[in-house]
């Protein structure tokens, strides 16, 4: 079972928490869900170069709080905060609610599964050899503290006539162990031969306390190791 399902979804409520954190009545749920999808799509399209790891959306009473985890926060904030203000106004128009934006820096993008997948996809689009891109990502992750990593690439790799799957694994990636802190990310590479898919699993150790926020708290503590979490709030 653990081999097939999304490892983040399998661990929700155990050591992972949701990226959308709000409660809604039945008649409001659909509208708010579509707003979340629009916000995430807009941010990912508008900030392609900002290395977005994830977008967390919270909705206190008649407000919307959006937290963007990025490896390049400077690209989001812009000169004197001009870009982040423009982004805040756009999200306010989408939600018709008072919007607060927080930017959290990802201090170790080499062990963030989503950012690894995006990096490999970009290299495939630039015609870098897929084996070289995968090996480089595996070596960087293991060097920076990951306990295990697995990378899958699928599609017409290297322009081959027949699509296939290539994968590399180093260290342990215990997908069945629910206490394992496993990060998972996907990306698509739009190449001249067609679309290639990239999946990445990163094992960061075991979380022994039963706490849905434990994984996020560990990420924040890791960010603090490099001189404090970089964070900007825009009301």
Swiss-Prot record:
Domain KH type-2: 39-107
Domain of life of the source: Bacteria
Matching Pfam families: KH_2, Ribosomal_S3_C
Gene3D superfamilies in alphabetical order: 3.30.300.20, Ribosomal protein S3, C-terminal domain
GO MF term set: mRNA binding; rRNA binding; structural constituent of ribosome
Region (Disordered): 215-235
Matching CDD domains: KH-II_30S_S3
GO biological process, one term: translation
Protein function: Binds the lower part of the 30S subunit head. Binds mRNA in the 70S ribosome, positioning it for translation.
Assembly mode: Part of the 30S ribosomal subunit. Forms a tight complex with proteins S10 and S14.
Similarity annotation: Belongs to the universal ribosomal protein uS3 family.
NCBIfam families in the cross-refs: rpsC_bact
Record protein name field: Small ribosomal subunit protein uS3
Gene designation per UniProt: rpsC
């Amino acid at each position: 079972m653990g081999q097939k399902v999304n490892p983040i979804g399998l661990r929700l409520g155990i050591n992972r928490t949701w990226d959308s954190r709000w409660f809604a009545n039945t008649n409001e749920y659909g509208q708010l869900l579509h707003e979340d999808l629009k916000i995430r799509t807009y941010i990912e399209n508008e900030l392609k170069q900002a290395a977005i790891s994830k977008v967390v959306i919270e909705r206190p009473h008649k407000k919307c709080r959006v937290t963007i985890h990025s490896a390049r926060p400077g690209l989001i904030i812009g000169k004197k905060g001009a870009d982040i203000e423009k982004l805040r106004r756009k999200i306010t128009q989408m939600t018709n609610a008072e919007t607060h934006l927080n930017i959290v820096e990802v201090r170790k993008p080499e062990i963030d599964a989503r950012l690894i997948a995006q990096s490999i996809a970009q290299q495939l689009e630039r015609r870098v050899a897929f084996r070289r891109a995968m090996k480089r990502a595996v070596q960087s992750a293991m060097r920076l503290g990951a306990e295990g990593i697995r990378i899958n690439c699928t599609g017409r790799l290297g322009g081959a006539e027949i699509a296939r799957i290539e994968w590399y694994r180093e260290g342990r990636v215990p997908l069945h162990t629910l206490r394992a802190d496993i990060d998972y990310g996907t990306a698509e590479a739009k190449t001249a031969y067609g679309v290639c898919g990239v999946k990445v699993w990163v094992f960061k150790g075991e979380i022994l306390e039963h706490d849905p926020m434990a994984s996020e708290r560990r990420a924040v503590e890791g960010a603090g190791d490099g001189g404090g979490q970089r964070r900007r709030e825009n009301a």
